[in-house]
C-alpha cells in the first residue's frame, strides 16, 4: 500500500497508482529472482497480481482516512519488510549461497521495491536519506542466519523471531529518531 499512497500524494491517475503500487510490491523480489537466474515469482502466480490490485483499490478508497491508520500501516509495512527479508534469505540458502550473499538477497527483496518506487516518483530513495530500513533487514537477516545455522529452533520460530527483530528495530528507530550517519 505504501506505493499506492506515495503515487496518490503525487496526484497520479488510477493507472499510475496501480503501476507504482505493483512495482513497489514486486520490485525487490523481481531483482532477486533475476540475480538468481530464476523465473520471476509473480509471473508464475496470478494470485500475487490480484492481491496487489485489490490492495491498491483498497488504498484508493481509504486514502481519505489514511492518517487514522498511520501506526497500523507502519506495523504492516514492518511485518512485510521482515517477511520479504526472510523470503530473500531463504531463496539464497536454497541456492546454497554464502550467508552474507543470502542477507544481501534478503535486503534486496525487502528494500528495492521502495527504491524503484522513489526513483519513479523522482525522489531520493527513502532508505538513503531518512529511515533505518535496510539496516533492520541486515540485522534481522544476520539474526535469522544465526538461528538457522547454530540453533535447534524450528524454522517457524526463526522466522517469527526475525520478523519481530525487524519490527522492533523499525519501531525503536522511529520512536527515538535513529538515523544512519550522513557522510559529509
Residue ranges and their predicted role:
Residues 108, 157-171:
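Small-residue-rich transmembrane alpha-helices that serve as helix-helix interface/gating elements
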Residues 33-43, 89-101, 146-157:
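Helix-coil boundary and interhelical linker segments in multi-pass alpha-helical membrane proteins
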Residues 15-21, 45-49, 70-81, 105, ...:
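Cytoplasmic-side transmembrane-helix entry/capping segments in multi-pass membrane proteins
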Residues 19-23, 30-36, 104, 108, ...:
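Short, structured motif recognition centered on aromatic/hydrophobic residues
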Residues 15-55:
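Alpha-helical membrane segments and adjacent membrane-interface helices in multi-pass membrane proteins
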Residues 54-92:
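Ordered, amphipathic secondary-structure segments that act as subunit-interaction surfaces
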Residues 40-54, 98-110, 161:
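Structural signature of hydrophobic alpha-helical transmembrane segments
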Residues 1-10, 30-33, 57-70, 115-125, ...:
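C-terminal ends of transmembrane helices
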Amino acid at each position: 500500500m505504501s506505493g499506492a499512497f506515495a503515487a496518490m500524494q503525487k496526484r497520479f491517475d488510477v493507472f499510475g497508482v496501480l503501476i507504482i503500487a505493483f512495482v513497489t510490491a514486486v520490485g525487490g523480489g523481481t531483482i532477486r529472482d533475476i540475480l538468481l537466474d530464476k523465473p520471476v515469482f509473480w509471473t508464475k502466480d496470478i494470485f500475487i497480481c490480484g492481491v496487489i490490485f485489490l490492495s491498491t483499490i483498497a488504498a484508493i478508497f481509504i486514502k481519505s482516512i489514511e492518517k487514522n491508520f498511520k501506526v497500523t500501516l507502519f506495523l504492516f509495512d514492518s511485518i512485510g519488510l521482515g517477511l520479504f527479508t526472510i523470503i530473500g534469505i531463504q531463496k539464497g540458502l536454497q541456492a546454497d549461497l554464502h550467508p552474507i550473499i543470502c542477507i544481501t538477497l534478503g535486503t534486496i527483496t525487502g528494500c528495492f521495491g521502495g527504491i524503484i518506487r522513489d526513483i519513479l516518483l523522482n525522489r531520493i530513495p527513502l532508505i538513503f536519506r531518512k529511515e533505518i530500513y535496510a539496516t533492520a533487514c541486515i540485522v534481522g537477516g544476520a539474526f535469522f542466519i544465526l538461528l538457522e545455522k547454530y540453533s535447534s529452533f524450528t524454522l517457524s520460530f526463526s522466522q517469527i523471531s526475525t520478523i519481530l527483530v525487524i519490527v522492533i528495530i523499525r519501531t525503536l528507530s522511529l520512536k527515538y529518531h535513529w538515523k544512519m550517519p550522513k557522510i559529509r
